[in-house]
Protein backbone atom coordinates (compact mmCIF):
# COMPACT_ATOMS: atom_id res chain seq x y z
CA UNK A 1 0.00 0.00 0.00
CA UNK A 2 1.27 3.45 -0.92
CA UNK A 3 4.32 2.01 -2.67
CA UNK A 4 6.78 4.57 -4.06
CA UNK A 5 4.97 7.41 -2.32
CA UNK A 6 8.18 9.46 -2.45
CA UNK A 7 8.26 9.53 -6.25
CA UNK A 8 6.60 12.76 -7.35
CA UNK A 9 6.09 14.37 -10.73
CA UNK A 10 5.26 18.08 -10.83
CA UNK A 11 2.87 18.84 -13.65
CA UNK A 12 0.20 21.15 -14.98
CA UNK A 13 -2.28 20.69 -17.78
CA UNK A 14 -5.30 18.50 -18.36
CA UNK A 15 -6.81 16.76 -15.37
CA UNK A 16 -7.41 13.02 -15.60
CA UNK A 17 -10.04 11.71 -13.19
CA UNK A 18 -11.61 8.31 -13.84
CA UNK A 19 -12.13 8.44 -17.61
CA UNK A 20 -11.77 12.23 -17.87
CA UNK A 21 -12.49 15.55 -16.20
CA UNK A 22 -14.74 17.71 -18.32
CA UNK A 23 -16.28 21.17 -18.11
CA UNK A 24 -18.45 22.52 -15.30
CA UNK A 25 -22.16 21.88 -15.05
CA UNK A 26 -25.15 23.93 -14.04
CA UNK A 27 -26.93 26.39 -16.29
CA UNK A 28 -25.28 27.08 -19.63
CA UNK A 29 -24.33 30.59 -18.50
CA UNK A 30 -22.95 29.29 -15.21
CA UNK A 31 -21.00 26.64 -17.09
CA UNK A 32 -19.38 29.17 -19.41
CA UNK A 33 -18.50 31.46 -16.51
CA UNK A 34 -17.19 28.65 -14.32
CA UNK A 35 -15.14 27.11 -17.10
CA UNK A 36 -13.60 30.44 -18.05
CA UNK A 37 -12.64 31.20 -14.46
CA UNK A 38 -11.26 27.69 -13.97
CA UNK A 39 -9.11 28.09 -17.06
CA UNK A 40 -7.70 31.32 -15.62
CA UNK A 41 -6.45 29.50 -12.50
CA UNK A 42 -3.37 27.41 -13.23
CA UNK A 43 -3.50 24.47 -10.81
CA UNK A 44 -0.59 23.50 -8.61
CA UNK A 45 -0.32 19.78 -9.24
CA UNK A 46 1.57 16.65 -8.25
CA UNK A 47 1.35 13.08 -9.46
CA UNK A 48 2.47 10.24 -7.18
CA UNK A 49 2.76 6.55 -7.95
CA UNK A 50 0.88 5.10 -4.98
CA UNK A 51 -1.23 2.05 -4.21
CA UNK A 52 0.13 0.39 -7.34
CA UNK A 53 -1.49 3.10 -9.44
CA UNK A 54 -1.22 6.76 -10.38
CA UNK A 55 -2.72 9.39 -8.08
CA UNK A 56 -3.02 13.07 -8.88
CA UNK A 57 -3.51 16.08 -6.61
CA UNK A 58 -4.58 19.35 -8.27
CA UNK A 59 -5.13 22.50 -6.25
CA UNK A 60 -7.04 25.32 -7.97
CA UNK A 61 -6.28 28.06 -5.47
CA UNK A 62 -3.93 31.05 -5.87
CA UNK A 63 -2.63 30.43 -2.33
CA UNK A 64 -1.36 26.94 -3.22
CA UNK A 65 2.40 26.38 -3.31
CA UNK A 66 4.88 23.57 -3.86
CA UNK A 67 5.16 23.31 -0.08
CA UNK A 68 1.56 22.16 0.13
CA UNK A 69 2.28 19.39 -2.36
CA UNK A 70 5.37 18.37 -0.39
CA UNK A 71 3.25 18.21 2.76
CA UNK A 72 0.72 15.97 1.00
CA UNK A 73 3.50 13.68 -0.22
CA UNK A 74 4.79 13.44 3.35
CA UNK A 75 1.27 12.77 4.60
CA UNK A 76 0.88 9.86 2.19
CA UNK A 77 4.29 8.59 3.30
CA UNK A 78 3.08 8.65 6.89
CA UNK A 79 0.01 6.64 5.92
CA UNK A 80 2.31 4.12 4.24
CA UNK A 81 4.14 3.68 7.54
CA UNK A 82 0.84 2.98 9.23
CA UNK A 83 -1.28 0.92 6.84
CA UNK A 84 0.99 -0.85 4.34
CA UNK A 85 0.75 -4.65 4.30
CA UNK A 86 4.12 -4.99 2.56
CA UNK A 87 6.27 -2.41 4.36
CA UNK A 88 7.95 -4.31 7.21
CA UNK A 89 8.15 -1.11 9.27
CA UNK A 90 4.42 -0.40 9.08
CA UNK A 91 1.95 -0.84 11.91
CA UNK A 92 -0.26 -3.15 9.87
CA UNK A 93 2.63 -5.38 8.85
CA UNK A 94 3.62 -5.77 12.52
CA UNK A 95 0.06 -6.55 13.60
CA UNK A 96 -0.16 -9.27 10.94
CA UNK A 97 3.27 -10.65 11.84
CA UNK A 98 2.19 -11.08 15.48
CA UNK A 99 -1.16 -12.73 14.68
CA UNK A 100 -2.05 -15.27 17.36
CA UNK A 101 0.82 -14.17 19.59
CA UNK A 102 0.91 -10.60 20.81
CA UNK A 103 -0.91 -7.30 20.88
CA UNK A 104 0.96 -4.64 18.90
CA UNK A 105 1.19 -0.93 19.84
CA UNK A 106 0.17 1.22 16.87
CA UNK A 107 -0.22 4.88 15.99
CA UNK A 108 -3.48 6.66 16.71
CA UNK A 109 -4.17 6.80 12.97
CA UNK A 110 -3.79 3.04 12.53
CA UNK A 111 -5.87 2.36 15.63
CA UNK A 112 -8.69 4.58 14.38
CA UNK A 113 -8.71 3.15 10.83
CA UNK A 114 -8.83 -0.47 11.97
CA UNK A 115 -11.62 0.37 14.41
CA UNK A 116 -13.52 2.03 11.56
CA UNK A 117 -13.02 -1.08 9.44
CA UNK A 118 -14.43 -3.27 12.22
CA UNK A 119 -17.39 -0.90 12.56
CA UNK A 120 -18.12 -1.30 8.85
CA UNK A 121 -17.83 -5.08 9.28
CA UNK A 122 -20.41 -5.05 12.07
CA UNK A 123 -22.77 -2.78 10.12
CA UNK A 124 -22.62 -5.00 7.03
CA UNK A 125 -22.85 -8.32 8.83
CA UNK A 126 -19.27 -9.18 7.92
CA UNK A 127 -19.63 -8.54 4.17
CA UNK A 128 -16.87 -5.94 4.47
CA UNK A 129 -14.34 -7.75 6.67
CA UNK A 130 -10.87 -6.23 7.27
CA UNK A 131 -9.53 -9.67 8.20
CA UNK A 132 -10.08 -10.93 4.65
CA UNK A 133 -6.32 -10.96 4.03
CA UNK A 134 -5.95 -14.79 3.99
CA UNK A 135 -8.48 -15.04 1.16
CA UNK A 136 -6.87 -12.18 -0.77
CA UNK A 137 -3.46 -13.81 -0.39
CA UNK A 138 -4.80 -17.18 -1.51
CA UNK A 139 -6.41 -15.91 -4.71
CA UNK A 140 -3.59 -13.42 -5.41
CA UNK A 141 -5.70 -11.69 -8.05
CA UNK A 142 -3.80 -9.01 -9.91
CA UNK A 143 -0.54 -10.98 -9.87
CA UNK A 144 0.95 -13.40 -12.39
CA UNK A 145 0.37 -16.57 -10.37
CA UNK A 146 -3.32 -15.97 -9.63
CA UNK A 147 -5.37 -19.16 -9.81
CA UNK A 148 -8.49 -20.76 -8.40
CA UNK A 149 -7.55 -22.35 -5.03
CA UNK A 150 -8.69 -25.80 -4.03
CA UNK A 151 -11.60 -26.16 -1.64
CA UNK A 152 -9.51 -27.18 1.36
CA UNK A 153 -7.28 -24.11 1.03
CA UNK A 154 -10.30 -21.91 0.53
CA UNK A 155 -12.08 -23.21 3.61
CA UNK A 156 -8.97 -22.78 5.76
CA UNK A 157 -8.58 -19.17 4.62
CA UNK A 158 -12.29 -18.48 5.10
CA UNK A 159 -12.15 -19.69 8.71
CA UNK A 160 -9.41 -17.14 9.39
CA UNK A 161 -11.61 -14.33 8.06
CA UNK A 162 -13.44 -13.17 11.18
CA UNK A 163 -13.44 -9.52 12.29
CA UNK A 164 -14.75 -10.60 15.70
CA UNK A 165 -11.27 -11.98 16.43
CA UNK A 166 -9.67 -8.53 16.22
CA UNK A 167 -9.20 -7.08 19.71
CA UNK A 168 -8.38 -3.54 20.79
CA UNK A 169 -6.89 -2.10 23.97
CA UNK A 170 -7.85 1.58 24.14
CA UNK A 171 -5.58 2.39 27.08
CA UNK A 172 -2.47 0.82 25.54
CA UNK A 173 -3.53 1.58 21.95
CA UNK A 174 -2.81 -1.95 20.77
CA UNK A 175 -4.37 -4.27 18.21
CA UNK A 176 -4.25 -8.05 18.33
CA UNK A 177 -5.32 -10.73 15.87
CA UNK A 178 -6.38 -13.63 18.04
CA UNK A 179 -5.64 -16.50 15.64
CA UNK A 180 -2.33 -17.42 13.96
CA UNK A 181 -2.56 -16.85 10.24
CA UNK A 182 -5.06 -14.00 10.41
CA UNK A 183 -4.22 -11.08 8.11
CA UNK A 184 -5.62 -7.56 8.14
CA UNK A 185 -6.17 -5.98 4.74
CA UNK A 186 -7.53 -2.43 4.55
CA UNK A 187 -7.87 -2.30 0.77
CA UNK A 188 -11.60 -1.68 1.09
CA UNK A 189 -11.14 1.62 2.95
CA UNK A 190 -7.46 2.55 2.59
CA UNK A 191 -7.69 4.85 -0.43
CA UNK A 192 -10.79 6.53 0.97
CA UNK A 193 -9.10 7.15 4.31
CA UNK A 194 -6.03 8.60 2.60
CA UNK A 195 -8.20 10.83 0.42
CA UNK A 196 -10.03 12.12 3.49
CA UNK A 197 -6.71 12.95 5.17
CA UNK A 198 -5.53 14.91 2.13
CA UNK A 199 -8.89 16.68 1.94
CA UNK A 200 -8.67 17.59 5.63
CA UNK A 201 -5.17 19.01 5.12
CA UNK A 202 -6.34 21.17 2.20
CA UNK A 203 -9.33 22.53 4.09
CA UNK A 204 -7.25 23.27 7.20
CA UNK A 205 -4.90 25.34 5.02
CA UNK A 206 -7.70 27.32 3.42
CA UNK A 207 -7.37 25.66 0.00
CA UNK A 208 -11.00 25.33 -1.01
CA UNK A 209 -10.90 24.28 -4.67
CA UNK A 210 -9.05 21.06 -5.41
CA UNK A 211 -9.31 17.55 -6.80
CA UNK A 212 -7.83 14.44 -5.24
CA UNK A 213 -7.66 11.44 -7.57
CA UNK A 214 -6.39 8.22 -6.02
CA UNK A 215 -6.09 5.64 -8.75
CA UNK A 216 -9.12 6.78 -10.71
CA UNK A 217 -11.52 4.90 -8.45
CA UNK A 218 -11.52 7.28 -5.46
CA UNK A 219 -12.09 10.95 -6.28
CA UNK A 220 -12.60 13.86 -3.89
CA UNK A 221 -13.74 17.27 -5.08
CA UNK A 222 -12.81 19.84 -2.44
CA UNK A 223 -15.29 22.64 -3.03
CA UNK A 224 -16.38 23.64 -6.51
CA UNK A 225 -14.41 24.63 -9.58
CA UNK A 226 -13.03 28.18 -9.54
CA UNK A 227 -16.03 30.32 -10.38
CA UNK A 228 -18.43 28.01 -8.55
CA UNK A 229 -19.28 25.52 -11.31
CA UNK A 230 -19.66 21.81 -10.62
CA UNK A 231 -17.10 19.25 -11.66
CA UNK A 232 -18.01 16.72 -14.34
CA UNK A 233 -16.42 13.34 -13.61
CA UNK A 234 -16.13 10.76 -16.36
CA UNK A 235 -17.56 7.37 -15.38
CA UNK A 236 -15.59 4.25 -16.23
CA UNK A 237 -17.17 1.83 -18.68
CA UNK A 238 -16.83 -1.50 -16.79
CA UNK A 239 -16.53 -3.42 -20.08
CA UNK A 240 -13.63 -1.37 -21.40
CA UNK A 241 -10.07 -0.55 -20.40
CA UNK A 242 -9.32 2.27 -17.99
CA UNK A 243 -10.03 5.60 -19.68
CA UNK A 244 -13.19 4.56 -21.55
CA UNK A 245 -16.38 6.08 -20.20
CA UNK A 246 -20.11 5.40 -20.22
CA UNK A 247 -21.01 8.96 -19.25
CA UNK A 248 -20.38 11.69 -16.70
CA UNK A 249 -21.69 12.76 -13.31
CA UNK A 250 -21.81 16.18 -11.66
CA UNK A 251 -20.23 16.58 -8.22
CA UNK A 252 -19.52 19.53 -5.93
CA UNK A 253 -17.63 19.23 -2.62
CA UNK A 254 -18.23 15.47 -2.67
CA UNK A 255 -16.49 12.14 -3.03
CA UNK A 256 -17.08 9.58 -5.75
CA UNK A 257 -15.83 6.02 -5.37
CA UNK A 258 -16.25 3.05 -7.70
CA UNK A 259 -15.76 -0.70 -7.41
CA UNK A 260 -16.07 -3.05 -10.34
CA UNK A 261 -15.13 -6.31 -11.97
CA UNK A 262 -12.90 -4.51 -14.49
CA UNK A 263 -10.22 -3.46 -12.00
CA UNK A 264 -8.35 -6.73 -11.34
CA UNK A 265 -9.22 -10.18 -12.64
CA UNK A 266 -7.90 -13.33 -14.29
CA UNK A 267 -9.47 -15.93 -16.57
CA UNK A 268 -9.18 -19.67 -15.91
CA UNK A 269 -11.07 -22.36 -17.78
CA UNK A 270 -13.00 -19.69 -19.64
CA UNK A 271 -14.31 -18.19 -16.38
CA UNK A 272 -13.47 -14.64 -15.29
CA UNK A 273 -12.52 -14.26 -11.62
CA UNK A 274 -12.44 -10.68 -10.29
CA UNK A 275 -10.97 -9.30 -7.07
CA UNK A 276 -14.13 -8.45 -5.08
CA UNK A 277 -14.39 -11.46 -2.78
CA UNK A 278 -17.44 -12.52 -0.78
CA UNK A 279 -16.26 -13.44 2.76
CA UNK A 280 -19.22 -15.80 3.13
CA UNK A 281 -18.10 -18.09 0.30
CA UNK A 282 -14.47 -17.13 -0.23
CA UNK A 283 -15.14 -16.75 -3.96
CA UNK A 284 -15.40 -13.64 -6.15
CA UNK A 285 -18.87 -12.16 -5.90
CA UNK A 286 -21.21 -13.30 -8.67
CA UNK A 287 -24.51 -11.43 -8.51
CA UNK A 288 -25.12 -9.82 -11.88
CA UNK A 289 -23.27 -6.58 -11.11
CA UNK A 290 -20.48 -5.06 -13.17
CA UNK A 291 -19.79 -2.02 -11.01
CA UNK A 292 -21.11 0.30 -8.35
CA UNK A 293 -20.38 3.98 -7.80
CA UNK A 294 -20.96 5.80 -4.51
CA UNK A 295 -21.33 9.57 -4.05
CA UNK A 296 -20.86 10.78 -0.47
CA UNK A 297 -19.42 13.59 1.62
CA UNK A 298 -16.88 11.22 3.18
CA UNK A 299 -14.29 9.30 1.12
CA UNK A 300 -13.73 6.56 3.70
CA UNK A 301 -17.46 5.83 3.81
CA UNK A 302 -17.66 5.88 0.01
CA UNK A 303 -14.73 3.47 -0.33
CA UNK A 304 -16.22 1.05 2.18
CA UNK A 305 -19.76 1.27 0.87
CA UNK A 306 -18.78 0.69 -2.74
CA UNK A 307 -17.32 -2.70 -1.80
CA UNK A 308 -19.99 -3.69 0.72
CA UNK A 309 -22.93 -2.80 -1.53
CA UNK A 310 -21.32 -4.64 -4.45
CA UNK A 311 -21.13 -7.83 -2.38
CA UNK A 312 -24.75 -7.34 -1.25
CA UNK A 313 -26.01 -7.24 -4.83
CA UNK A 314 -28.47 -4.90 -6.52
CA UNK A 315 -31.60 -5.28 -4.41
CA UNK A 316 -30.01 -5.50 -0.95
CA UNK A 317 -27.24 -3.06 -1.86
CA UNK A 318 -29.68 -0.44 -3.11
CA UNK A 319 -31.82 -0.78 0.01
CA UNK A 320 -28.74 -0.49 2.23
CA UNK A 321 -27.49 2.64 0.44
CA UNK A 322 -30.89 4.30 0.64
CA UNK A 323 -30.75 3.92 4.44
CA UNK A 324 -27.46 5.82 4.62
CA UNK A 325 -27.90 9.59 5.12
CA UNK A 326 -26.13 11.76 2.58
CA UNK A 327 -25.16 8.83 0.34
CA UNK A 328 -26.19 8.19 -3.27
CA UNK A 329 -25.21 5.38 -5.64
CA UNK A 330 -25.73 3.76 -8.98
CA UNK A 331 -25.28 0.12 -9.94
CA UNK A 332 -24.38 -1.19 -13.40
CA UNK A 333 -25.79 -4.66 -14.07
CA UNK A 334 -24.69 -7.31 -16.56
CA UNK A 335 -27.43 -6.24 -18.99
CA UNK A 336 -25.93 -2.70 -19.11
CA UNK A 337 -28.76 -1.14 -17.11
CA UNK A 338 -27.92 1.65 -14.68
CA UNK A 339 -29.90 1.58 -11.44
CA UNK A 340 -29.51 4.89 -9.60
CA UNK A 341 -30.80 6.21 -6.31
CA UNK A 342 -33.28 9.05 -6.72
CA UNK A 343 -30.75 11.75 -5.90
CA UNK A 344 -28.42 10.71 -8.75
CA UNK A 345 -30.74 10.07 -11.68
CA UNK A 346 -30.66 13.67 -12.92
CA UNK A 347 -26.91 14.04 -12.33
CA UNK A 348 -25.79 11.24 -14.66
CA UNK A 349 -25.34 12.05 -18.35
CA UNK A 350 -24.89 8.94 -20.51
CA UNK A 351 -22.61 9.18 -23.53
CA UNK A 352 -22.50 5.51 -24.54
CA UNK A 353 -25.39 4.02 -26.51
CA UNK A 354 -24.59 0.65 -24.93
CA UNK A 355 -26.01 1.73 -21.55
CA UNK A 356 -29.46 2.81 -20.41
CA UNK A 357 -31.08 4.09 -17.24
CA UNK A 358 -33.26 1.40 -15.68
CA UNK A 359 -36.92 2.41 -15.68
CA UNK A 360 -36.66 4.75 -18.67
What are the residue ranges of the model-derived segments?
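Mature catalytic core of soluble alpha/beta enzymes
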Residues: 2-360
